[in-house]
Amino acid sequence: TGTKEELRLGKSLKSSIADGYKHAFSAIFDSNLTTIITGFILLVYGTGPIKGFATTLIVSILTSFFTAIFITRLIFEAGLNRGKFNNLTFTTHISKNLLTNTRINFLGMRKIGFTVAIAIIVVMVGSLAIRGLNQGIDFSGGRNYVVRFDKPVKPVEISEMLKPAFEGSSLSVITITSDDQVRISTNYRIADQDENIDKEIETKLYEGMKSVLGDASYEEFTENMIQSRQKVGPSIADDIKVGAFWAVILSLIAMALYILLRFRDISFSVGTLASVAFTAFSIIGLYSLLYGILPFSMEMDQSFIAAILTVIGYSVNDTVVVFDRIREVKGLYPKRDRALVINDALNSTLTRTLNTSLSTAIVLLCIFILGGDVIRSFTFAMLFGVIVGTASTLFVATPIAYEIQRRSCLLYTSPSPRDTR
């Protein structure tokens, strides 16, 4: 995007590429660093698979940053020096004039944006108060059983078979790896210390699913068909829940502090904090609103928290790009009205924002549709978070920063009524 902007200014291809990389470096560095901060928080407060996810996230971000900044530039420069890239345009006939020279008055729509955001918050608070959350065994305590059958089975049918036996307790059945293997989760009598509880539960599983077990005996079922067992006691679940809470809170604080240190402007920090908090709360509220309605598991577990923290990092990426452009435009036109500066920054980064969000959403949608039930909940949270995070950058983070600046008179002199209506 930066190179295309330089080309539109009439610069040569070589100069455009050099200046594009130069001007984009700070935004790319900031956005990647915020995601790495999220990764380290996950690494500290996560357990088991979440630590693995955090490690993968950090390594992939570092690799992506290195290739985006250095490797791609080396390729472009090598191609230009050999005369093979002389006809590069970085556009197609469709994208050439797409979203160029837009003049959307984002700040003029800030009251509408605030109203919609408040309405969403009210709905989500109502859902959390009435329905609560469908907590997985990571947070509520419980047992997991991975069961392999001799033929493909449907999780919904297995769940219906087992409901009478586990009435009054949570029960979740999802497909993992293949159609003949499911994971059954329940918090049935998790607080009891009776030594016979495990045998009682496995007996209930065997009796409840007898119609799909064929001629398998109880011994064959427990020894061969149950692939794995996992128990999370109430005290461990409480520890995981506390760790997840602090992971989210510390991520929000870390992002706000980094933005404050990077841009030296409290309004940017508050705007970022409000935006990512709104995004995270929207995801939590949506899971409260839709669990039991959508045909896949919407449990609140460690994977769900990982999705929220990843979305927080992603949302900050967009916000950092916009704030970096505001700082750049302000440096070029120090006496320009603050509303014009912010609207110009939002419009000039709109193509980049939408391209990044759309490409990410397409990948997540493919994973959501083609992936298994195990990651469907995670990808759904990510997909929804990308959409809400993009919208909150445009209609929550930046307008809040503007309102703080306008009210405290931290920047410029007097806003133009024409541009702030």
Predicted features along the sequence, with ranges:
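Hydrophobic transmembrane alpha-helices and their membrane-interface caps
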Residues: T1, S269-R327
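Short helical (or helix-break) motifs at transmembrane helix termini and adjacent helical loops
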Residues: T1-K11, I28, F65-T67, L309-K330, ...
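Juxtamembrane helix-loop transition segments at the membrane interface in multi-pass membrane proteins
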Residues: T1-S16, V59, R73-T92, F323, ...
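Helix-loop junctions and hydrophobic alpha-helical segments within the transmembrane domains
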Residues: L7-L33, Y333-T351
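Hydrophobic, glycine/alanine-rich multi-pass transmembrane helices and their short helix-loop junctions
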Residues: F29-I71, Y258, N355-E403
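Internal alpha-helical transmembrane segments of multipass membrane proteins
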Residues: L33-L42, K241-S282, L286, S357-I369
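Structural signature of multi-pass, alpha-helical inner-membrane proteins
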Residues: G46, N81-D265, G271, L290-D301, ...
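Single conserved hydrophobic/aromatic residue that forms the stacking wall/gate
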Residues: Y412-R421
